[in-house]
């Protein structure tokens, strides 16, 4: 993965998966106060710190806690956090560090990270991706397949997408609200469960839920 600077966290049970599927969680970017902090292992180090009993609590960890509650459907003990994170892959899409905590990546930074993203898909072959935030989802590569929507508990339709690896392996994508601020774990748990239930038969899903396709150039 020569274009990947920020290496993903890959849980020790990733290939066993979540509900039997390889699940990739995708954030947008890393904020680094100093460029010397932008090391390749930063993603791995952040996730490992979440269930380190000796690590002090910091406010940013609430984001990861709320997301994992939306995935599991309940609060987790420290050991349950370790088990859950070891069943998934976590990757931040943008491969350049941002220099401000509320600074958005530029269009060039998003597009400059496309090749690395596809390298991750080819290497780790997730079955499904949960993407954090509308801005990230709207800036993902727009080649691939638009699938039918997932319906939220309040009747809202949530668009889903899919990519294919070079050998035709399907990777489906669900965008969720970024799990910070006004994020309801219970609401998004229902959405995620609806999405994951479509993964039981990927061939049937692709033919049944396919909406439109855009060729990857």
Where are these regions (language model features)?
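Active-site and ligand/interface coordination hotspots across diverse enzymes
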Residues: 1-62, 113, 161-164, 197-217
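Extracellular/periplasmic catalytic domains that process cell-envelope and extracellular macromolecules
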Residues: 16-20, 82-83, 123, 166-169
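Short, solvent-exposed loop/turn segments at secondary-structure junctions
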Residues: 29-33, 94-98, 134-138, 178-182
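C-terminal capping/extension of enzyme domains
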Residues: 3, 104-115, 138-217
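Proline-aspartate-enriched helix->loop->beta-strand connector
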Residues: 117-134
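Short, surface-exposed acidic-centric catalytic microdomains
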Residues: 36-104
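A structural signal for short, well-ordered beta-strand segments and their strand-loop junctions
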Residues: 24-26, 81-83, 87-92, 128-133, ...
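A Trp-anchored, charged/polar loop motif used as the substrate-binding/catalytic surface
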Residues: 2-15, 65-77, 109-119, 156-158
């Amino acid at each position: 993965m020569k274009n990947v600077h920020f290496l993903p966290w890959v849980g020790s049970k990733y290939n066993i998966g979540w509900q039997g599927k390889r699940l990739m969680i995708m954030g947008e970017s890393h904020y680094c106060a100093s460029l010397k902090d932008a090391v390749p292992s930063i993603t791995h180090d952040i996730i490992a710190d979440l269930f380190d009993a000796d690590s002090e609590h910091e406010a940013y960890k609430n984001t990861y806690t709320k997301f994992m509650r939306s995935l599991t459907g309940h609060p987790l003990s420290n050991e349950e956090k370790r088990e859950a994170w070891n069943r998934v892959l976590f990757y931040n899409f943008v491969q350049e560090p941002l220099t401000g905590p509320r600074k958005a990546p530029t269009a060039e930074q998003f597009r400059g990270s496309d090749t690395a993203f596809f390298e991750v898909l080819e290497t780790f072959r997730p079955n499904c991706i949960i993407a954090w935030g509308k801005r990230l989802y709207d800036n993902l590569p727009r080649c691939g397949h638009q699938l039918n929507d997932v319906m939220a508990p309040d009747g809202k339709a949530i668009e889903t997408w899919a990519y294919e690896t070079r050998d035709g392996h399907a990777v489906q994508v669900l965008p969720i609200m970024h799990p910070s601020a006004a994020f309801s774990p219970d609401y998004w748990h229902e959405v995620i469960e609806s999405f994951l239930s479509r993964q039981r038969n990927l061939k049937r899903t692709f033919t049944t839920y396919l909406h439109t396709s855009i060729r990857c150039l």
